[in-house]
């Protein structure tokens, strides 16, 4: 990275590495970040921070540099977890993350350390999706530390004006202005202005259809899909059922509802997905995905049958894998306006469909989802709200939700 050898693969990282004012701190942090792994287990960052001081004092490193290295060793998992499991457009997430990084220089070093750590874990551990998530978190955190306004009328209006300047079709300006005002504010912050224009153009073309799916971008082997459909309870489960049927794996999802000029409530959802093959294969699946989703919306197909139709595997073809302990965490502290549900379990086809169905069956709405897979272990994270649009604060309801999710996973384990 510092030599620029990986500029084609990691342009942002190479630029930042070339501008590093204190490379010694980063090099020592990279060398020592896992020094506590054999001794500390789950708490190896804490143990590693202690041991790194011993090593660096023996080497005669300056006290100020030792403190910085210790901090990076202690926090070396933090950026990866936030990037792959949290909504980086939530101001509370950014506030808490940037409080951990010791300023803009600390952010730069933590980003480079995280990139080096993930990339060297195994040949396939760094994917283009993970790289994109890390890059986006770095840019958002840098903007936050630089004092850019996080949210509010001023920033919202600035984004709208930037987007409107890109809109070329004056005949449909009324539709576009309504589109911008009808979607929730977080949509404006979570998407690039050019992406918003693409979404609006697609939403206009899809007005007459109950469901439409379009490829937005391809970054082999990943594909970004936009789904515009008539909104209804359980729509996300229907969409993920079609993905499961086509053997597409979802890595992130943004879920938005808006009311069109004709009074219909529409959903605009953005997904990052991949198949087991190159991106072009997933592109060819889009017409079939549309047909399946239209059938589900019309009530002509059953979501469970669609989701499980391609799931059967001969027992002899399923290779044994290490067991993965299932954990369900329900968190009301990590997000400004949503309850965060984090499900860690063994990965399996259709898992997102079953989890989203379970969550929506108890009356909760999913606004955002992020899925991070590491080998056979998956962390599915959902940002949810109750019927009134707020957090789930009732402890009995939280326990019921946790119980239902665990029950769903137990049934999957039992083959039911």
Each language-model region and where it sits:
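Conserved catalytic alpha/beta cores of large enzymes that bind or transform nucleotide phosphates
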Residues: 5, 56, 62-66, 81, ...
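Residue-level signal for alpha-helical context at structural boundaries
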Residues: 11-16, 66, 70, 87, ...
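Divalent metal-dependent catalytic cores for phosphoryl transfer on phosphate-bearing substrates
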Residues: 16-147
């Amino acid at each position: 990275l510092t030599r620029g050898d990986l500029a084609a693969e990691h342009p942002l990282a190479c630029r930042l590495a070339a501008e590093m004012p204190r490379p010694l701190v980063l090099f020592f942090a990279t060398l020592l970040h896992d020094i506590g792994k054999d001794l500390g287990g789950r708490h190896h960052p804490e143990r590693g921070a202690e041991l790194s001081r011993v090593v660096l004092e023996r080497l005669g490193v300056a006290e100020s540099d030792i403190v910085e290295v210790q901090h990076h060793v202690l926090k070396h998992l933090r950026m990866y977890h936030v990037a792959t499991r949290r909504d980086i457009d939530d101001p509370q997430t950014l506030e808490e993350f940037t409080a951990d990084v010791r300023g803009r220089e600390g952010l730069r070093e933590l980003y480079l350390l995280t990139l080096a750590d993930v990339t060297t874990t195994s040949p396939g551990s760094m994917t283009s999706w993970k790289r994109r998530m890390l890059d986006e978190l770095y840019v958002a955190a840098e903007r936050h530390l630089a004092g850019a306004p996080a949210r509010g009328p001023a920033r919202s209006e600035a984004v709208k004006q930037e987007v409107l300047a890109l809109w070329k079709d004056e005949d449909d300006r009324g539709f576009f202005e309504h589109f911008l005002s009808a979607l929730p504010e977080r949509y404006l912050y979570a998407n690039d202005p050019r992406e918003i224009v693409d979404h609006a153009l697609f939403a206009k073309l899809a007005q007459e259809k109950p469901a439409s799916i379009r490829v937005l971008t391809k970054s082999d082997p990943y594909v970004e899909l936009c789904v515009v459909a008539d909104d209804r309870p359980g729509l996300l489960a229907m969409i993920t059922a079609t993905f499961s049927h086509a053997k597409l794996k979802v890595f992130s999802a943004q879920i938005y509802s808006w009311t069109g000029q004709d009074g219909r409530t529409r959903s605009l959802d953005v997904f990052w997905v991949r198949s087991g093959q190159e991106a072009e294969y997933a592109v060819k699946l889009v017409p079939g995905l549309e047909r399946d989703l239209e059938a589900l919306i019309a009530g002509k197909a059953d979501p469970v049958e669609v989701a499980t139709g391609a799931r059967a595997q001969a027992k002899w073809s399923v290779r044994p894998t290490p067991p993965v302990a299932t954990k369900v965490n329900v968190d009301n502290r990590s997000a400004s306006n949503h309850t965060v549900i984090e499900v860690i379990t063994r990965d399996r086809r259709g898992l997102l469909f079953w989890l989203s169905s379970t969550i929506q069956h108890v009356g909760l709405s999913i606004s955002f989802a992020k899925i991070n897979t590491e080998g056979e272990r998956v962390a599915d994270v959902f940002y949810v709200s109750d019927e009134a649009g707020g957090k789930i604060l009732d402890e009995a309801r939280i326990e019921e939700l946790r119980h239902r999710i665990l029950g769903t996973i137990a049934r999957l384990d039992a083959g039911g």
